[in-house]
UniProtKB/Swiss-Prot annotation:
Family: Belongs to the PPR family. P subfamily.
Keyword annotations from UniProtKB, A to Z: Repeat
Stretches of the chain forming a coiled coil according to its record: none
Residues in PPR repeats: 120-154, 155-189, 190-224, 225-256, 264-298, 299-333, 334-368, 369-403, 404-438, 439-473, 474-508, 509-543
Name of the protein this chain belongs to: Pentatricopeptide repeat-containing protein At5g24830
Record-linked InterPro entries: Pentatricopeptide_rpt (IPR002885), TPR-like_helical_dom_sf (IPR011990)
Amino acid sequence: MALLISCGEVTSSQFTVFRLLNQSLDFVSDNVSRLLAPIFTNLRDFEMRLSCIERPPSISGNHSHLCTEKWFSDQKDYDQKEDPEAIFNVLDYILKSSLDRLASLRESVCQTKSFDYDDCLSIHSSIMRDLCLQGKLDAALWLRKKMIYSGVIPGLITHNHLLNGLCKAGYIEKADGLVREMREMGPSPNCVSYNTLIKGLCSVNNVDKALYLFNTMNKYGIRPNRVTCNIIVHALCQKGVIGNNNKKLLEEILDSSQANAPLDIVICTILMDSCFKNGNVVQALEVWKEMSQKNVPADSVVYNVIIRGLCSSGNMVAAYGFMCDMVKRGVNPDVFTYNTLISALCKEGKFDEACDLHGTMQNGGVAPDQISYKVIIQGLCIHGDVNRANEFLLSMLKSSLLPEVLLWNVVIDGYGRYGDTSSALSVLNLMLSYGVKPNVYTNNALIHGYVKGGRLIDAWWVKNEMRSTKIHPDTTTYNLLLGAACTLGHLRLAFQLYDEMLRRGCQPDIITYTELVRGLCWKGRLKKAESLLSRIQATGITIDHVPFLILAKKYTRLQRPGEAYLVYKKWLATRNRGVSCPSILNHMHTEEQ
């Protein structure tokens, strides 16, 4: 047909038919890529990958388009002129266009495959990391399996994310299996991979396997670093393995990482902390001496570990000495340093020194925190110096540091224990003015103060106010009121409170029943007290010797030793481990004398 066209031996109608045929050929040529794709790449893999991404912009559709319109001349009047050279030119152009189109198609398929692989790897790896961070480890493992099945292996960073997620979730066996798979099919695990798995093994107390993995790292061409050693040493210290008798083990661990590396401050800190916790003060100070000899720079963390260890062992003089050495070396004490010393002084009852150190702390430019005030306020209240504790509470407010509700409760309870309910109410009102909401412990402290002063009506009023502020009374609330009612002889009121407890779903405890037994004995209703005691035993509540002792003492005072002895035998039947049995007989003997 091309020969006829070039010679001009066709009519216009035939020419139109030929044009339609060539347009059909163009349509077929546009779809050749779909027909030839299975030849250049695997059909299943190609379709799966191509569905993941859009067609790359670099691959244009006209690369494989056969420009047949150029085969025809624009000349319409051929005048029956024969031109054999034109025929060969047309055939040559057709062949060249077909070969160019075939080469372009092959290049397009190869580019599509390469683009799809890299893009899928990046997208799927990102999804896997997100799944690990969200804790969806099963989905991440499933995606990894699918990627490997399709010939795409996630990178090392993605595998490390997966290892970290598995270890944090406690799936240590899966993490161990993943490392083995990485060694077999890639990517090869690095030091971070091993550190993650070793830390996971140590977290589940499998230190033996962690040590084995640590020792086999060199076999796979991975040299442990300082992080690896820190993890191992910390785990061994927690287990109590590293001590005076096995210092050689520590040296082997350190030699495995970097033979010429200086002594690591983190390892030294871990060792000293472990020694102090195990009571090995001398060994801890030997580590410090070795640090000084090797010129290892000490920071505030190292000094805080030493000072805390010395304070725990009661060596306050040495603790002060290290604080002075700390300042000489240009390391400023921080809030943890002062809190450690203040806490130790309060435990020893040296509140004047603790308060002076608190002032030194402020003068030195270190702002006290909640713990600094909490230690002193609690210590002063326990020691009975509530007014001074209240001064520290006010000092917090002046420093724009709002005390937590616990500190308010401690001061209110301190005043309440000494019967100073007016001061307790003043602190409560100040607490409310600063927007701190009272809780059940606040009200219990106030009730305790009223009960201590014999003001049962005021205590009852506080209980009713609790319910109006949507604070539910607890067992302690009822025990305080019930005990006060029994002490004042209001036995009926005490049992009303007991019934209210049950209605409100508040479970009585041994203190509740002990107060009721005491009230019944005080009223002389001993048989009912014995009956209540039997009911207590039937409920299965853990019972101590106190209610038996109250009842036995009452029988002894009434010169009824036989019944007192029966109570003692009932106590023997309980076999309570908390108190020795002869204690009741000793009290009974004392009462008889």
